Regions:
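Secondary-structure end/capping motifs
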Residues: 193-260
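A structural signal for short loop-to-beta-strand junctions that line the ligand-binding cleft
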Residues: 65-73
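Pocket-lining segment of extracytoplasmic ligand-binding domains
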Residues: 129-220
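A local structural motif
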Residues: 23-32, 119-129, 266-273
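Bilobed "Venus flytrap"/periplasmic-binding protein-like clamshell domains
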Residues: 2-21, 80-141, 148-152, 252
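Beta->alpha turn/N-cap motifs
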Residues: 10-11, 35-36, 46-60, 70, ...
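Hydrophobic residues within well-ordered alpha-helices
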Residues: 43-44, 135-137, 261
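Long, low-complexity C-terminal extensions of enzymes
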Residues: 251, 259-280
Length: 280
């Protein structure tokens, strides 16, 4: 049985839709759903064979190969990686303030640190176990929201005094002119060497499911919206902001992200990307 991880956010429901609804037949696979940080722990502990993980976790873990042609990437605005606050109006207002960071994120937590350091903004970072923005703002001046929590927060903007002071995808785009790669699909190196045909099989199914999703984005957005209690039209807009390919432009952006992380002291060494080669 192949153990396949899945991020428990709407942005991962989309590329898995064809697989999970038996549109893309798949056999001898167990899908294990969790948040990105926990998935990284599971694949590191050999509890998963293949999984999406926060992109920043790739250089922090050993003996992983990247699967080609699939990622979770934004071209600009993300709508699901946000800094929100009640009283503050911009990232510059965070200077000397406290920013709550959910423990379920790694890439976004690194990205906000890079953005603030590059802007010369220094604040206090407060790890938070909960994801409710109201709880986070009781102990901090601003909150980093990711995934479905961010989407739900946007839906409530007109009903509360909560404000989005930054969309990190847009901030990264403004700083670098590049896409932002949030998640990668990886396989344990020893597993790939022992069972290359199984990895090839899963990759093929993932890419077919991803392609099905792109061809049926409106239909799937309606269904995911109902499941997540998010307006269907907004869900369609959200899914259109994301890119699930992993082309050369995305690879270049990922390398830039790792370079900045190292410059900011958030990575210890330079990163060498290793890919699973189809047909090995």
């Amino acid at each position: 049985m192949i153990r396949l991880g899945k991020i428990g956010f709407a942005n991962c429901d989309f590329p898995y839709y064809g697989i999970e609804h038996n549109i893309i037949p798949i056999e001898k696979v167990t899908i294990i759903e969790s948040h990105p940080v926990n998935l990284a722990k599971k694949i590191s502990n050999r509890e998963l064979d293949i999984s999406p993980i926060s992109s920043i976790m790739y250089p922090k873990l050993s003996n992983l190969w990247i699967l080609p042609d699939i990622s979770i990437t934004s071209n600009d605005f993300t709508k699901s990686v946000l800094v929100c606050a009640n009283e503050l109006g911009s990232l510059e207002d965070l200077s000397g303030k406290t920013l709550c960071i959910p423990e379920t994120t790694a890439t976004s937590a690194t990205l906000i640190r890079i953005l603030l350091l590059k802007k010369g903004i220094h604040c206090k970072y407060m790890p938070c176990k909960g994801l409710e923005v109201s709880d986070m703002l009781k102990i901090g001046d601003a909150a980093l929201l990711i995934g479905d929590s961010a989407l739900h927060a946007i839906m409530k903007l007109n009903k509360t005094k909560l404000k989005v002071i930054a969309d990190l995808g847009n901030e990264w785009k403004n700083m670098t002119g590049k896409k932002m790669v949030y998640a990668l699909w990886v396989v344990r190196e020893e597993y790939a060497k022992k069972y290359p045909e199984k990895v090839e099989y899963i990759l093929k199914k993932l890419l077919l499911s991803k392609d099905y999703g792109m061809e049926h984005i409106s239909e799937i957005a309606d269904l995911i919206g109902k499941k997540k209690n998010i307006d269907s039209e907004f869900m369609r807009e959200y899914l259109h902001t994301l890119n699930y390919d992993f082309d050369m432009e995305s690879i270049d952006s990922l390398k830039q992200f790792f370079k900045y992380a190292k410059e900011c002291g958030l990575l210890e060494k330079e990163v060498n990307l290793k890919f699973f080669e189809r047909g090995i």
